A protein has these predicted regions:
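PLP-dependent aspartate aminotransferase-fold enzymes
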Residues: 100, 128-221
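Short, hydrophobic/aliphatic alpha-helical segments
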Residues: 35-44, 73-80, 131-132
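Active-site-adjacent loop/helix segments that line or gate small-molecule/cofactor pockets in enzymes
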Residues: 19-68
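Electropositive phosphate-/nucleotide-binding environments in soluble metabolic enzymes
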Residues: 34-38, 68, 95, 99, ...
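Active-site and channel-lining beta-strand-loop segments
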Residues: 63-84
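Hydrophobic alpha-helical scaffolding
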Residues: 30, 34, 116, 206-209
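Glycine-rich loop-to-alpha-helix module at the N-terminal edge of alpha/beta enzyme cores
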Residues: 2-11, 81-163
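Non-catalytic, mobile gating and regulatory segments of ester bond hydrolases
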Residues: 1-31
Length: 221
């Protein structure tokens, strides 16, 4: 049922939003219903670049300040309710602020606080569970972010193979490390969105086009 609905959605034509409609939406919604968000973001900009700590929070005409989350709903500082299609970029797949997860996190915090920097039994339990659910993951190591994971993967691969070149999917986001900031968002854009990264850094980085095996094969030959 769900797959059929998604297929039907994908087959629908792409419509663009007219400038007049967008302007009306800004005035009718953001200007009238998101006043506190705008005020707080303007204040945050005085000390935080862009007013937010993560790019996912950027929004036009200004970021929305969220103060509550539960299940598939988000609530902003002005009291507006939203359906959460972002899911924190992917990790909150069971919804936000799940009761079971929250209670377990609180229990752990009461026992040893937010961090000790040392090993905890749950680290092994998580690694084992992931390996059981995804058999191809024979070994599992957690890192602080996707950027660090990609940096580590590149280094390990180079060490294991003795090769230098890296091939990434064009248009895909592989973190903010210098060597992978190539062809981001749109395939074939090369270093268009790599401001501040010297060109020589990409000497061993290439990209292939998504869903194009021939493009990948040409890079591998």
């Amino acid at each position: 049922m769900l797959n059929a609905e998604l297929d039907a959605l994908i087959k629908k034509p792409i419509y663009s939003i007219s400038r007049s409609a967008l302007k009306e939406y800004e005035e009718e919604y953001f200007a009238k219903k998101c006043k506190k968000s705008k005020e707080q973001i303007e204040e945050a900009k005085t000390i935080i670049p862009g007013g937010v700590q993560h790019n996912l929070a950027f929004n036009y005409p200004f970021p929305i300040v969220m103060v509550k989350a539960k299940g598939n709903r988000l609530y902003d500082v002005d009291g507006n309710e939203y359906y959460d299609f972002l899911q924190a970029g992917g990790p909150t797949i069971i919804g936000s602020n799940d009761d079971v997860v929250r209670d377990k996190v609180i229990e752990l915090l009461e026992d040893c606080g937010p961090s000790t920097g040392l090993f905890h039994p749950y680290e092994y339990k998580l690694a084992k569970k992931i390996s059981e659910c995804v058999p191809s993951v024979e070994m599992f190591r957690m890192l602080g972010s996707g950027t660090e994971a990609c940096m580590c993967a590149v280094r390990v691969a180079r060490l294991a193979t003795g090769h230098k070149n890296v091939i990434k999917m064009g248009g895909a986001y592989h973190g903010w490390s210098d060597q992978l900031a190539w062809g981001m968002r749109v395939p074939g854009t090369l270093n268009l969105q790599s401001h501040g990264v010297p060109l020589f850094v990409f000497k061993h980085t290439q990209e292939f086009f998504p869903n194009d095996l021939k493009s990948l094969e040409r890079k591998l030959i």
